[in-house]
A protein has these predicted regions:
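A short glycine-rich, His/Asp/Glu-containing loop-to-beta-strand
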Residues: 14-64, 117-126
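A short beta-strand-loop-beta hairpin characteristic of the jelly-roll/cupin
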Residues: 67, 73-94
Length: 126
């Protein structure tokens, strides 16, 4: 059995802004833990330890554009955020969504809380 896990990559555009890209991680059947049935697994390359973030963005009325501090995976755990890239495109992300933030240069992107606070995410540098 095989499959894929979809994720959104946010990368710097050639015009100096940011843009969304839809991508997938291939999944294959493996025996991850002895005693449990086989499951679909995939690899997410990470460079170092993960960072857990919990934030109540309700006090930020007008979020400013910002860059990703480094290339990183963002695993949404709780809450719903909206990310806007330079061309005005917006996407919402919630629990279970996977984002690859790569726009370390240029204008960056805007992140807004659209659900109830707080939101929680796990950041994996890589």
């Amino acid at each position: 059995m095989t499959g894929t896990k979809s994720f959104t990559r946010i990368a710097a555009s050639t015009a100096g802004g940011s843009a969304f890209h839809d991508e997938e991680i291939p999944l294959d059947t493996s025996l991850a833990i002895t005693g449990l049935p086989s499951m679909l697994t995939g690899t997410i390359p990470a460079a170092s330890a993960a960072v857990y973030v919990r934030h109540d963005m309700s006090g930020a009325p007008h979020p400013a554009p910002h860059n990703a501090p480094r290339r990183q995976w963002v695993v949404m755990l709780r809450g719903i955020i909206e990310v806007e890239v330079t061309d005005g495109s917006r996407r919402t992300f919630g629990p279970g969504d996977l984002i690859r933030a790569e726009d370390t240069d240029g204008t960056g992107h805007v992140t807004r809380l659209v659900g109830d606070p707080p939101w929680e995410a796990l950041y994996l540098p890589g």
